[in-house]
Amino acid sequence: MKITWMGHGSFRIEIADQVLLIDPWITGNPVFPADRRDAALAGATHILITHGHGDHTADAVALSKELGAPIVGIYDLMSYWAETEGVETVGFNKGGTVMLGDVAVTMVNAVHSSSLGTDHGPMYAGAEAGFMIKGEGRTVYVSGDTDVMADMKVFNDLHQPEIGILASGGHFTMDMERAAYAARTFFDFKTVIPCHYKTFPLLAQSAQPLIDGLPGTDVRTPEVMETIEL
C-alpha cells in the first residue's frame, strides 16, 4: 500500500487494484506543487469525496472528466453532480459499503458540515462523512473533516483500522491534541497520518502535539507529495 499526501485533506492511496484520490484539491491549493500534478493523478481509478466544501471538491468534477474516474461519495451530492455535470458517480450513504475493484469502501459518520458554494451562498451538499477503506488485508480510516466523536469506538469495533488519516489542524476540525485523544481513546492504530494542517496560517503548523500525545504509535508526517509505503 502506498499513501501520498497531496497537501491539506488530499491524498492518493494505491491499494490492491485501485488508485484512489481522496478529496483531491489541486487548483488553488497553496501547498500543492504544480509540477507534480501528473504524478499525483497518474492511473487514478476513483475519486472519493468526504463532503462538499470547496477545499475538498474544487477539482472533483473536472478531474473526473479528465481522468474518466467516477466520483464516490454521499448520495445527495453524487446525484446532483451526475445530473448537472454528467459525470459518472457512485452514491451511497453512511453504513453502506461499495466495492471498487478489490477494495471495499464503507462510509462512516463525521461531525462537520457540508455545502457547495454558489452565487447565492452555501447550498446543501448532503452530509459530511469519513471512509473505511479495506484492501490488501488492511483497513485505512480516512476521517474527513470532523471533531472527536464517540462513534469512533463503534468504527474501531466494526472495522479495526490499522491506519488512521486524521484531519487535525484545528479551527475547522479537531486539533492535534483532540486527534491524539481520539486515536488513543477509540482506536488501535499502528500508524497515524495527520492532515488538514500547514495549508494556511489559521491552521496548525506542526504535528508535534499529535506525536507527543501518541507515544508508541507510528505517527508519520510526510511532506507534500511524499509517498509512504506500508
Swiss-Prot record:
GO function term, MF aspect, one: hydrolase activity
Keyword field: Hydrolase
SMART domains: Lactamase_B
Pfam family, any one: Lactamase_B_2
Hydrolase listed as a keyword: yes
UniProt superkingdom: Bacteria
Family per similarity comment: Belongs to the UPF0173 family.
Matching PANTHER family: UPF0173 METAL-DEPENDENT HYDROLASE MJ1163, UPF0173 METAL-DEPENDENT HYDROLASE MJ1163-RELATED
Protein name in the entry: UPF0173 metal-dependent hydrolase Dshi_2788
Naturally occurring in which organism (per UniProt): Dinoroseobacter shibae (strain DSM 16493 / NCIMB 14021 / DFL 12)
Highest classification ranks of the organism: Bacteria, Pseudomonadati, Pseudomonadota, Alphaproteobacteria, Rhodobacterales
